[in-house]
Amino acid sequence: MPKICQITKKKSMLGQNRSHAMNATKKKFSLNIQYHTFWLPEKKKKIRIRITKKGIRMINKFGISKIYKKYII
């Protein structure tokens, strides 16, 4: 399964490590993805989401019901 946040739709990105001599090596910047379980009161069930830490903060700010309706996970 690809590392994509189900809320923010962010993916890993590619870049470069640079040494002091400015030699470049390829690097993959990965996301802080975690599985998280939320309780949906209107559906009366738990949902398990693969989500980044930023997505968890969005849910804490706006509420799981509003995010669920907007993004329909």
From Swiss-Prot:
<dbReference type="GO" id="GO:1990904">
    <property type="term" value="C:ribonucleoprotein complex"/>
</dbReference>
<keyword id="KW-0687">Ribonucleoprotein</keyword>
<dbReference type="InterPro" id="IPR026569">
    <property type="entry name" value="Ribosomal_bL28"/>
</dbReference>
<keyword id="KW-0689">Ribosomal protein</keyword>
<protein>
    <recommendedName>
        <fullName>Large ribosomal subunit protein bL28</fullName>
    </recommendedName>
</protein>
<dbReference type="InterPro" id="IPR001383">
    <property type="entry name" value="Ribosomal_bL28_bact-type"/>
</dbReference>
<dbReference type="Pfam" id="PF00830">
    <property type="entry name" value="Ribosomal_L28"/>
</dbReference>
<dbReference type="GO" id="GO:0006412">
    <property type="term" value="P:translation"/>
</dbReference>
<comment type="similarity">
    <text>Belongs to the bacterial ribosomal protein bL28 family.</text>
</comment>
<dbReference type="GO" id="GO:0005840">
    <property type="term" value="C:ribosome"/>
</dbReference>
<dbReference type="InterPro" id="IPR037147">
    <property type="entry name" value="Ribosomal_bL28_sf"/>
</dbReference>
<dbReference type="InterPro" id="IPR034704">
    <property type="entry name" value="Ribosomal_bL28/bL31-like_sf"/>
</dbReference>
<dbReference type="GO" id="GO:0003735">
    <property type="term" value="F:structural constituent of ribosome"/>
</dbReference>
